[in-house]
A protein has these predicted regions:
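An N-terminally biased module of ancient metal coordination in phosphate/nucleic-acid-related enzymes
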Residues: 1-82
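Hydrophobic faces of well-ordered beta-strands that scaffold small-molecule active sites
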Residues: 6-10, 56-60, 85-89, 113-117, ...
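Acidic-and-aromatic substrate-binding clefts and catalytic sites of carbohydrate-active enzymes
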Residues: 63-70, 91-99, 122-128, 151-158, ...
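N-terminal cationic-hydrophobic initiation segments that often serve targeting/anchoring roles
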Residues: 77-80, 108, 165-166
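Catalytic pocket-lining loop regions of alpha/beta-barrel enzymes
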Residues: 128-191
Length: 191
């Protein structure tokens, strides 16, 4: 019998129904495997691609429809009928709190377990906003986690996220992509 696992960071893409402006727009990333990312994959193909027994996944948003993120959650429900899953959706972390709450309420779905807002590079400064702290408290109060995607080498942002974690001890914060390391020594200091 193979080892049972839950894959905690999976992206399914539906380039027909989804928007993915970062992937299909005028300036897609210059990644070497971009065409593989664009290829549609079924849950069955994912399960069959590993020697592990995949008992569940956590799907992380990737820009399906950031104006109406519930559309991605609904699509996932139809696409992943035979695989237990939870989903992390999009919500702008530094938006006014009433707007953040309204957007969160519009995403009510049994699979929703957290929120991600990509704050890489200069976007990281949005994590310094007072609204970010208020909205993280909303997530904590709703038992939803925050998927933080920022360069951990940015010490000001890393210190701020650590401060939030201390102030909101019930909030789960997950650092995406290992904090996007580019300089190992600086990254280690950030960790």
């Amino acid at each position: 019998m193979s080892m049972q696992i839950i894959d905690p960071h999976v992206h399914f893409f539906n380039l027909v129904e989804g928007q993915y402006t970062w992937l299909q727009g005028e300036n897609p990333p210059a990644w070497p495997n971009l065409e593989k990312i664009k290829k549609p994959i079924s849950a069955e193909q994912l399960v069959g691609s590993t020697d592990f027994e995949l008992t569940g996944i956590v799907h992380i948003e990737a820009g399906f429809d950031n104006q109406s993120p519930i559309n991605e959650l609904n699509w996932l429900s139809s696409h992943l009928k035979n695989l237990p899953f939870k989903a992390v959706s999009y919500n702008q972390i530094d938006s006014p709190t009433d707007q953040f709450k309204s957007a969160l309420n519009a995403q009510t779905h049994p699979s929703l377990c957290g929120i991600r807002d990509i704050t890489e590079g200069t976007d990281a400064k949005r994590l310094l906003s007072a609204n970010s702290f208020k909205n993280l408290a909303v997530l904590s109060n709703n038992q939803l986690h925050f998927e933080a995607q920022f360069n951990i080498e940015n010490s000001d942002i890393t210190k701020q996220v650590a401060y939030y974690a201390k102030q909101l001890p019930q909030l789960q914060i997950i650092i995406n992509h290992a904090g996007l390391p580019s300089d190992l020594a600086t990254w280690q200091q950030g960790v």
